C-alpha cells in the first residue's frame, strides 16, 4: 500500500469473491445516495458476480469503470479517522443576521457505521506508511504534524494523461482534518494532488 504497487493489488483482487467485493463497495456507499443535502454525483462501482475475471485487476487498482467523487472519498477517509463512523457533510457552519448574531448553527451528525474500529485502525496503520516512507513521503515526512493518507493516479485515455489524487487526514492519534485533492492532467501540469493537499494542511496548522 505504501508504494501503491498495482501488481500486488491486482494479485490480491483476483482472490476476491466478486459478489462480496461489490457488497463491500456498496457498504461504503458506492451506487448509493450519500447522506448529503447538497448537489453531488453518485459514485459508481460496476463489478458484480457476473463480471468477467479480467475486469478485476483494473478495478482493484482504481481504474476501469469505477468512479468516485472527492466528496465521497473524503467521507470514507473521515470514517477511517473516526473509527468507522461516517459523518454527514455540511458546508455552512452558521447563519448570522445583519447584527452579526448567530441565528442558526450547524453541528456534526453521524450517518452510520461503515466499518469496524479495528478495520479503520488497520487501514490507518497501512496509510501511515504512504506518508512516512512511501509515495507521499516527499510531501508529508518530517513535518510538525503527521499525515495519514493515500496517493492515487487515474489514467483517463490511451495517451498517458492522468489525474492525480490524494486523500488523507492529519494527526491520526487524535485526528484534526481530512483533505481530499485532485489535479487534472497532472502529467502535463506537474502539480499533484499530494502537493495541493500539503498546502491545505500547512495553511490549517499555520493559523
Tell where the protein language model's regions lie, with residue ranges.
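Short amphipathic alpha-helical face segments that pack within enzyme cores
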Residues: 69-75, 192-199
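Beta-lactam-recognizing serine transpeptidase/beta-lactamase-like catalytic domain environment
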Residues: 1-184
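Short, gly/Ser/Thr-rich active-site loops of penicillin-recognizing serine hydrolases
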Residues: 102-104, 194-207
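Conserved active-site neighborhood of the chymotrypsin/trypsin-like protease fold
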Residues: 6-8, 189, 194
Amino acid at each position: 500500500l505504501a508504494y501503491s504497487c498495482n501488481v500486488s493489488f491486482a494479485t490480491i483482487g483476483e482472490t476476491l469473491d466478486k459478489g462480496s467485493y461489490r457488497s463491500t463497495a456498496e457498504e461504503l456507499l458506492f451506487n448509493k445516495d450519500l447522506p448529503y443535502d447538497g448537489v453531488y454525483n453518485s459514485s459508481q462501482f460496476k463489478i458484480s458476480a457476473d463480471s468477467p475475471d479480467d475486469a478485476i485487476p483494473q478495478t482493484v487498482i482504481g481504474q476501469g469503470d469505477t468512479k468516485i467523487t472527492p466528496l465521497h472519498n473524503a467521507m470514507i477517509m473521515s470514517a477511517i479517522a473516526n473509527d468507522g463512523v461516517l459523518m454527514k457533510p455540511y458546508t455552512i457552519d452558521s447563519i448570522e443576521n445583519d447584527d452579526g448574531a448567530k441565528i442558526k448553527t450547524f453541528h456534526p451528525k453521524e450517518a452510520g457505521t461503515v466499518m469496524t474500529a479495528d478495520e479503520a485502525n488497520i487501514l490507518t496503520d497501512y496509510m501511515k506508511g504512504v506518508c512516512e516512507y512511501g509515495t507521499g513521503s516527499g510531501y508529508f515526512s518530517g513535518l510538525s504534524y503527521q499525515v495519514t493518507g493515500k496517493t492515487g493516479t487515474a489514467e483517463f485515455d490511451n495517451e498517458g494523461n492522468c489525474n492525480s489524487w490524494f486523500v488523507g487526514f492529519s494527526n491520526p492519534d487524535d485526528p484534526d482534518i481530512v483533505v481530499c485533492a485532485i489535479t487534472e492532467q497532472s502529467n502535463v501540469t506537474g502539480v499533484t494532488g499530494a502537493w495541493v493537499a500539503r498546502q491545505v494542511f500547512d495553511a490549517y496548522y499555520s493559523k
